[in-house]
């Protein structure tokens, strides 16, 4: 019989700076060797629970505690952060903030250096764990020079080398491309089988986590545990949608088809879903949708054979890249990390100049436009809003671009007020920006661009790190902007966003435009998925596993029907 390794008994925690508890009456037992997924909307208490487990609460973040919590048999109120660190290893969402060493090898060895382990033993351990996480060929590289997935593996190895009993992963998929995310979940599964450690995963992307099995899913909201059950049982219920958490798309498809999920087996295992009514009902539902071809607007932006390299003797980051963007389109730009997506946006904005090729704006040569002149036509919103914000107050921040352009004060007041209404920020117009959530700050940065009345808006990962509720709010807001005539390009790793909200996808790979097609066509093309480090949509995988006659048409049907359900 497995022993408890983490227990919370009627546990509540309230930060000193807050008027109400963040965790309320938590009753929870996690056993040795379990793999547990913790999900919930932003502010649900997930991170606070994790900080109680790894000792940051109460050692770093102080507050009032009621009840008891023990980790590896130690009361967290009586145990130092140092002592708990031997039992709990944490891999942070921001891996750059976790690096210590100048090389991968040094970073992995850091914990052993602190423990004064003999060098021969240390080298042996570094070699062992670097092989497990497939970094043994990169030991002399700087961690900062690696891809997002490789950086995460460095952090994993640095934690694993300490042989902690409990491994805590904080949003391990947040900054990874789809294939790297899938590889990360497989690696976590391999590590758990190898070490028999207890694994806790905090993550928004439920469907992506379930590509490997988990023992339990804990659903949190408003500081309490709403549900604690197996994945199979949870997916039969409406708990996820009630709590504003995205359920797997194939589960939504079965609901649309009127399938009784209580009669479905292996609901948490995509390739093994079965039930007497599943195939006939899905077949009946998946008739080809009647679709009206969208009429393209006039040409807005055209790139002709554009090439760029950062180093004169280095590889081309963009190579003979050609594409045409039309007025009113909403397009996703996808591809693995380092594919050239960000370079493409920098060239369009004029931050860097290509060595060859043409850029045309409404048929006119764009190369002679200054950055300021381009900024009047193109808005660029960075992934992290904190890197764009200059002022303390919302109204001042949104007005800044107009002030710098010497726009008359009366016109500034009128335009800023109008944009704040459009962005849903008017009630907060006199608030300090520091009081806003991450998603609200993102809206402020978008508002500060929109007030300049650009025709094209480029967003880098517009929904990164947001729960499903805030994700939906952001994407609904962007759709409304698109309906107002703003052309939108989104750089994203989120295949759901690409599938559900855009009608065209540009796939970038090694600096080239690998494909320009509908999102459904992209995410059902096996060769394209492999080449660009994408991930086949679960809808297509589900349809193939069921044996539906035309999985592609089924996927198209779902996307069209789902849009109709959500937007009418």
UniProtKB/Swiss-Prot annotation:
NCBIfam families on file: PRK13648.1 (NF010167)
Q: Which family does the record claim for this protein?
A: Belongs to the ABC transporter superfamily.
Q: What does this protein do?
A: Probably part of an ABC transporter complex. Responsible for energy coupling to the transport system.
Tell me which GO cellular component terms the UniProt record holds: ATP-binding cassette (ABC) transporter complex
Transmembrane regions: none
SMART domains membership: AAA
For this protein, the record's Pfam families field holds: ABC_tran, DUF3744
Q: Where in the cell is it found?
A: Cell membrane
Swiss-Prot/TrEMBL keywords? ATP-binding, Cell membrane, Membrane, Nucleotide-binding, Repeat, Translocase, Transport
Q: What is its EC number?
A: 7.-.-.-
Q: Name one GO molecular function term.
A: ATPase-coupled transmembrane transporter activity
Positions binding ATP 1 in this chain are 40-47
Q: What is this protein called?
A: Putative ABC transporter ATP-binding protein EF_2153
Cited InterPro entries: AAA+_ATPase, ABC_Co_transporter, ABC_transporter-like_ATP-bd, ABC_transporter-like_CS, ABC_transpr_CbiO/EcfA_su, ECF_ABC_transporter_ATP-bd, P-loop_NTPase
- Note the SUPFAM superfamilies from the entry: P-loop containing nucleoside triphosphate hydrolases (SSF52540)
Tell me what topology the record assigns in the membrane. Peripheral membrane protein
Question: Which positions bind ATP 2?
Answer: 335-342
Residue stretches making up the ABC transporter domain: 6-247, 301-535
Keyword Membrane listed: yes
- Which PANTHER family does the record match to this protein? ABC TRANSPORTER ATP-BINDING PROTEIN BC_2655-RELATED (PTHR43553:SF26), HEAVY METAL TRANSPORTER (PTHR43553)
